[in-house]
Amino acid sequence: MKINENKKDIKDIVNEILISLNINESINIEIKPMKQKIASFSFKTKTLRLNKYVVENFDEELLHYIILHELIHFKIKSINHGIKFENELRNYFSKNECDEIELKIIQKLI
């Protein structure tokens, strides 16, 4: 799905992140309205679910972070945000960068 003319296709962003995480498995992508979440990942069906509002209204930087976040869960095979998760995320963003991006996400949602 093309976000808009100025943004990359979601599949392209996902594929870039899969490559950077050295994940050699294919995943499904669903974009749908979600009331409580901006994204989720199902280990059972290998499905990345993205909130339609987020896809349509967030810029590429924020989408990249959200997708990376979910795919790190897939890579480490855990829903937790423990040391393994944090270490993997730090390969891409510093703690300060994460805090700044997460603040932007919150501001876009309120």
Swiss-Prot record:
Write down a Pfam family by its short name.
YgjP-like
CDD domains noted in UniProt: Peptidase_M48_M56 (cd05843)
The record ties this protein, via InterPro entries, to:
YgjP-like_metallopeptidase
Give the protein family: To M.jannaschii MJ1213 and A.aeolicus AA15.
User: What is this protein called in UniProt?
Assistant: Uncharacterized protein MJ0123
What species is given as this protein's source? Answer: Methanocaldococcus jannaschii (strain ATCC 43067 / DSM 2661 / JAL-1 / JCM 10045 / NBRC 100440) (Methanococcus jannaschii)
